[in-house]
Amino acid sequence: MTKTNINKDKIKFSNLHKSFFSELKDTSCDISDSNVIIYDNSKKNSDPACVELRVKGQLYEVYYWDGYSLADKFTIENYEIAILQFKKFSKKLARILSRY
């Protein structure tokens, strides 16, 4: 059985945000049934860097936005692999945000 409700893994995503972004003040993590997004919420950038996991039907889409353009997009049917990719993009986002 494939999990399709991201909200069931709310604690997992919250802990991921805390572990990667604990030293960064201006980040947020929003979680709903159909998506989870971690983003830079500083007022400096009108189009902030973010990483997002979305459910679209039977597919899971992971987006990595570097603040300038869509840097990466990953689409897959397997929830566990989508979570792994979300984690990789989150780590990448944390590294980039820590430079500024």
Task: Tell what function each PLM region has.
Residues 1-45, 69, 99-100:
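Negatively charged, low-complexity tracts enriched in Asp/Glu with abundant Ser/Thr
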Residues 28-30, 35-38, 52-54, 59-61, ...:
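Ser/Thr- (and often Asn-) enriched beta-sheet segments in non-cytosolic proteins
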Residues 45-71:
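Short aromatic-glycine-(Arg/Gly/Cys) micro-motifs in beta-strand/loop hairpins
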Residues 67-81:
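A short, exposed loop/beta-hairpin motif centered on an aromatic-Gly-Thr core
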Residues 82, 86-90:
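Short amphipathic C-terminal alpha-helix that caps PH/PH-like domains
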Residues 92-100:
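Short, Lys/Arg-rich amphipathic alpha-helical interaction segments
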